[in-house]
């Protein structure tokens, strides 16, 4: 069976699953230097993605469109070529506890000169399906809890087992937008307007809080206002909880909460306020998860999957793992909506077969494209050992290999690699990428060496947990040490078939150091480079390696 999942709104993507195997997933931001979070506003993008991967729309057995905003159903206004099309979709959240797999059928999916029928499952269902079906629990057939916390919903807990999944409870009445909304009122992204929502702010704030400290007096203010605005018996809190299905009113309530916070905390250092806000939400998450498990005991459910945009918060993921409530915690590399097309396709598989495992690779994104390299760049064959030598000479390299990684984080397929041995390298990488000085640079490290350098240093192939850099190594690899000593670590086996693992092995032979700086290769505010030509046109790194060829800028020396 061949299923095509489609995510039309922000983080637009097309994914095809065939007989239980992920064939590809094309996120629109990773095509043609598109903007981050690019939506699909023309169905021609679906036709193009299918064609690029050798699939004809007529050969798809079932199209599935991810659901979106709406209490009973959603609506999408798109184009097919130049023709306006209106498509019905499922709502954001299931309508009853056992309704995750309730679907809405539609017609009018116009792809080229043909019109197809489709199904649509709730948006939350795609998160549950993508998280569980890619997990080790699906492979072993074990049950799991699944936490979904997205921008405009409360954190929702589900129980997945066999052929069914059911809603357990909402942990507490705070929408995921709260994290980024705090940045409208405190810190470097403070705004005078409530508009101009930036999906990238939450991650930047996560970096900024390393400059601050948690203070219980600030946390106490957030706790008091939380009761007044969200959780208590006040008229304000009751109205908020009653209108949660209205995304505009729920966001306005979050803004009101932080506006009230700003009135009481205006004299505090913004970095301390944001650090305390982060901690307040983290403690609330951990405490309410523990309460949920105490009041809703589920035999055998000692596994946890995490999905939704808040699943990109590595500190919260680690805090949940460190509670001891779970034997194992799984976060896919695409917990946010970048995984929703995959999840939409999985919904149909689940409806037919139950929560079966998906055969997948994180390197299932778009293939590298051909393109004309700018005049003056010198191209020559280049071995992996030669790449390692360039890196050992303290020169960064844009490293492009095979198919792109899935999700928002560069994992060695569309990366800028660099030696981590000087503190200046972090500043240099932030400068060439037009990033703030406090932003961290991630390490990519050989898995077997990671416990020597990081704590816990456990396998983390997708950069989804927090690690502390051990003291002897903080001076050896300062470029990957964040301001609070932490690191957003990616580990990779030295036996991996991916070329970036070979680079690390060769670099270790030359230097004794088993890690490198790893940051995404892209224009500022755009998706990953689709080609070597794009990286050369960008031109802010003098060496570009692409599947065996090294491109050198005219001013560069090897």
Curated annotation (Swiss-Prot):
Which biological processes are named by the entry's GO terms? Answer: biosynthetic process
Q: What is its EC number?
A: 2.1.3.-
Q: Name one GO molecular function term.
A: transferase activity
Arranged from A to Z, the UniProt key words for this protein are: Nodulation, Plasmid, Transferase
Q: Is Transferase given among the entry's keywords? A: yes
Q: What class of enzyme is it?
A: transferase
Q: Which InterPro entries match?
A: Carbam_trans_C, Carbam_trans_C_sf, Carbtransf_dom, NodU/CmcH_Carbamoyltrnsfr, Nodul_NodU
Q: Which cysteines are joined by disulfide bonds?
A: none
**Domain of life from the UniProt record:** Bacteria
PANTHER family in the cross-refs: NODULATION PROTEIN U
As for what it does, the entry says:
Involved in 6-O-carbamoylation of Nod-factors.
Concerning its family, UniProt says: Belongs to the NodU/CmcH family.
The record's annotation in NCBIfam families points to: nodul_NodU (NF041651)
What's the protein name?
Nodulation protein U
The organism is Sinorhizobium fredii (strain NBRC 101917 / NGR234)
Lineage of the source organism? Answer: Bacteria, Pseudomonadati, Pseudomonadota, Alphaproteobacteria, Hyphomicrobiales
